[in-house]
Amino acid sequence: MSEINDFTNSIIINESDTKYEVYSEVNSSNRWIAKEDCPSPLEDVWLLKLAGHKRKLEEPLSCMRNEEPASKQREIEKFLRTDLDHSENDFLTQEVDEFPSTQQLFPIPLQNDTAFDSSEESITKSSKSSFSVLDIGLPMSALQRKMMHRLVQYFAFCIDHFCTGPSDSRIQEKIRLFIQSAHNIAKHPSLYDTEVRNPSAAESTNSHVSLDASNFSSYAENSSKFLFLQELFKNLSPSYSKTFFLFISNQFLANTLTQWLKSQNIDAELWAEEDAKTSQHPAIWICVSKKAPSASHFLQSCPDLSATIFYDIEAYMSVTSSLPSIQSLVLRLIHLGSIEHAIKCFQSSYNASFLVNIVGVVATLSSSSEENSEASNLSTLFEKSGNFEEILGSESHSSITEKTRDIAKNVATWLKNGENFSSWPLPPLMDLASLSVAEPRDSQPSVSQVNDTFVKSSDSTFPSSQSMQSPSKLHSLTSNATDLLSSSSLKKNFFSQQEADEVELSNNYDLQGAAVQYLQRRLRMVEDELHEAINSKNVQQSRSEELEQQISKLTDNLQEYRNTVRELKLDLEKSKKKNEDLSKLEVEKVEEIANLKKELTHLAKQQEFGFKYVQEFSNEDLQGKLIEANEKNYKLTQLLKTQKEDADFITNQYQNASTFAAEQSKEVAKLQAECKRLQAINSKVMEEVKVYNDSRVEALLAKVSSLEETLKILEQKSLPKFTPHNQSPRIIDSN
């Protein structure tokens, strides 16, 4: 029974194919148990704990799924994370309620409370201001294009519904989210990380917020506006002495742009209210649009002001609504193919269809070529303009950088040459008004043409310029056609009442068919979302399995930590004992110190007693003895000095002699070795000479003997000449 209790209080921390690894909380030990030998209560407890652990993991996931707005934003975030960089991921994680309304997106007074109804008078007033506005079209970076494409892909259903079908408050909120995200992309991609991860930094007005210098290069790479401003001031300096004033709608971007320009050795400063009275001006003042009233006097009276630059379209609309008159030249930076470009092209027709056109055109421009294959007027427009690559984003990064630098160089040259408007070096921006999705073309279409266009629009992923028609416009066209037919029948009796009913029935049938196709497309979108939800569930399940493995590893680490704590407790007890021994030793040392102090006191008393007798001698005697001792000490010192010098001399002599003796010994040894060598050579030579002499003597003796023999022979040969006459001839012949 106790063993079962031990098992019940145990935890299975690991599992193999045939065994369980069990950690016992009673004795704090691990052991392996075969599965067939493992009691069933232990397995039941293990399974219950495992099920409880899985429930704990699934609880936060279910809570996430129950949060309708937040979960939708997480779907957006997950969708945008696919094959994207870190800087592209987190820009749609805020709640929908946190995004500003249409009135805040376009800071122009509205006539009523309708979300998408604005004042035509206000936009006409701002567009017809007294100052001259020159638009500088800059290509979007690859990152901005990719983010816009992903953004349109995600909001495709809402965009299609908003442009072709009836839109309720939920669709309008999503469209507000889409518009705000498109504005942020047009400003700078780095804005999202700051707004999502650190909202206080994005809203902060502190101009001394430090930025990571390693990321400075990414600011110009991700936005051609940063690169344009850098190249513009590099081409202007140092000969150009006038100052510029730049308006920007976001405080964080203002801080970032200021510090980035300073890092490029450009004199840039943030504008403050107290700067209106200063007489010294940098190369460029950077001002947030909400501070525009404080700069009104400066813009009107500064003689050194060259131009007022608007970084984004929001800043332009906000500033021009509060400052209707600007005396200087106005330059407006616009990304080609962005929402800024669309607003610029449609601001002359600011009516109820304004946002429908903006959303539809931006969706069309940010879609792929396959998605825009049905938009024939789109390709015709690009062929006429010649800016196909700039709008659809088929240019490379190096080409975008080179084009931006050329634009900045041309603008700088134009400013240096006197700002002649007739010689403005940049071509006008492409007019996107022909891509209108909520207004009719040159010729008014018939009712059947409108219905056919409405049916065709259901087959495309994104509404093209031909296929998208607003529901209000469609209804008005149908009503106008019906009214026209009715009035004609009354005046000329051309149509009968039966024919009018047939026309109305045909129109209703076409509308129902379009609605069916719209619902089918919506069903496909829901199926895609369901597929993504299933994939997300699989990812979460794999993540839970990874967490289980991590928990098992953490359990092992916990056991190691417990063992470490036990060892530390033992060390603590040893330390306590050691401290007790040290405290005892300290007490003994204190007692020893006290005894030594007593001895010192006793010795001091004895010393005082001895000094009494020393003090009885007279000072004169002591001084005389001291003088004698000093003289004696001086003599001994001199003697010691002399002896030391003698000793040093003797030592030096001895050392020199020793050195010389060692050298002589080495020389003698060397000479002895040389002598022995020469003796050996001499003896060898003598032996060779002796051998040579002996051999020579022997050779000479042999030669002498041979000569003697020869002489004898010769003598014998010469004897007949001196032979006596009485010698016999036979003897002579014999000789």
From Swiss-Prot:
Coiled coil regions in record: 514-719
Subcellular location: Nucleus, Nucleoplasm; Chromosome, Telomere
Name of the protein in its database record: Coiled-coil quantitatively-enriched protein 1
Example GO BP: meiotic chromosome segregation
GN (gene name): ccq1
A Gene Ontology cellular-component term: shelterin complex
Task performed by this protein: Component of the meiotic bouquet that facilitates meiotic nuclear reorganization of the telomeres to the centrosome. Links telomeres to the meiotic centrosome component pcp1. Essential for the formation of normal telomere clusters during meiotic prophase. Required for telomere length regulation and chromosome segregation. Required for proper positioning of nucleosomes at heterochromatic loci and for transcriptional gene silencing (TGS) function of the Snf2/Hdac-containing repressor complex (SHREC).
A molecular function (GO) term: molecular adaptor activity
Broad class of where this protein is predominantly found: nucleus
Keyword tags: Chromosome, Chromosome partition, Coiled coil, Nucleus, Telomere
Quaternary data: Interacts (during meiosis) with pcp1. Interacts with clr3, pot1, taz1 and tpz1.
Organism listed in the record: Schizosaccharomyces pombe (strain 972 / ATCC 24843) (Fission yeast)
